[in-house]
Each structure stands twice: as C-alpha cells, then as structure tokens.
Amino acid sequence: MSKSALVILAPGAEEMEFIIAADVLRRAGIKVTVAGLNGGEAVKCSRDVQILPDTSLAQVASDKFDVVVLPGGLGGSNAMGESSLVGDLLRSQESGGGLIAAICAAPTVLAKHGVASGKSLTSYPSMKPQLVNNYSYVDDKTVVKDGNLITSRGPGTAYEFALKIAEELAGKEKVQEVAKGLLVAYN
C-alpha cells in the first residue's frame, strides 16, 4: 500500500514551499492530497499565484495520512494557526504517531495548537522568538528531524525539506533517484 500525504494549502501560503513539497512527494510515489483550508476553490498564495486544491480540508480532515505537510508563508501560517480544524488534525496526527512536517513560518502553527512541545525544530529565522519557549530551537541546520517532526527554514531549503519527508516515507534509494532526476544534491 502506498504512503499518503496531506498538504494543507492556506491563503498566503509560500508557493515554492507548497509546490516543491507536493511535487517531490508525488515523484517519490506518495499519494498526495492537496486540501484547501477554506474549501476547494482556488487559493491565492503569497506572491499572488493561484492554486486549485484537490479538495477541502473539511472533506479529508478525518482521513488518515502518513504525513501532514504545512507549507510556510506568513499569511498561510497565520490562517492555519487560527483554524481549529488544523489544530484538531495536528493533535490527532501527533497522538497517532504520524509524521508532521512544517517549513518556514509554519512551525508557529504547531506552537499555536500545542503540538510537538519540547521537540527540536527550526524555522524561518524571524519566527524564532515565537518558538524558543516551547521548543529546542536549532539555528545551524536547514532541516531538523526529531521523532515524527520534520521542520525546515524557508523557500531555499524546500527541496531538502521535501526530500527528507520523501525519504521517511519512500526510503533512501527512492529519494536518491528522485533527487538525481531533479538535479538536486541530496545526502
């Protein structure tokens, strides 16, 4: 049975982080569901690119996924942080031992919903003050994995972030194959 990923798409999401995560995971053979936070209509991202989700988050919130991916972008992260549905989903994912992945500003969503407290993580540098009290903050790594949590810093680290998620779900050999096809170095 193939692994599955839920990528939440919220208004103001960082396009690169969203696209790279969804694309890399699909290339690795993972079944990716893109769910719009506010429904199934097109979502305007941080640089005014509009993306059409597969479905609404409400439609799939009770489904089980191997990973829940939170792309960054300040607007998208704020919207996810204010969503009780996202909070319930993340707490369920955490209690069930599922993987959670957050990049850029999205680790603040974890803090707002009380998820993964005490774990090591990283984020976009300006988000650090919102995270240092509840997490072990890592400044010197572009991707941090602590148990079932994967975090990363921003748009420039999106490939490494996505490949790390893919490695967890599809294995090192498959990820090396995907990285090679993308002309991206990955160890």
From Swiss-Prot:
GO terms for biological process: adult locomotory behavior; cellular response to reactive oxygen species; glycolate biosynthetic process; glyoxal metabolic process; larval locomotory behavior; negative regulation of developmental growth; negative regulation of phosphatidylinositol 3-kinase/protein kinase B signal transduction; regulation of hydrogen peroxide metabolic process. Its main location: mitochondrion. Oxidation of Cys-45 and Cys-104 in response to oxidative stress. Levels of oxidation increase with age. Disulfide bonds: none annotated. GO terms for molecular function: peroxiredoxin activity; protein deglycase activity. InterPro entries: Class_I_gatase-like, DJ-1, DJ-1/PfpI, Prot/Nucl_acid_deglycase. The active site is at residue 104. It comes from the Eukaryota. Keywords: Cytoplasm, Mitochondrion, Nucleus, Oxidation. One of its GO terms (cellular component) is nucleus. Expressed in the head and testis (at protein level). Ubiquitously expressed at constant levels. Changing residue 104 to A/D: Lack of oxidation modification; results in increased sensitivity to oxidative stress. NCBIfam families: not_thiJ. Plays an important role in cell protection against oxidative stress and cell death by acting as a oxidative stress sensor. Does not play a role in methylglyoxal detoxification. Plays a role in mitochondrial function together with Pink1. In motor neurons regulates structural synaptic plasticity of locomotor behavior as part of the PTEN-phosphatidylinositol 3-kinase pathway in response to oxygen species (ROS) levels. This is Protein dj-1beta. It comes from Drosophila melanogaster (Fruit fly). The lineage of its organism: Eukaryota, Metazoa, Ecdysozoa, Arthropoda, Hexapoda. The gene is dj-1beta.
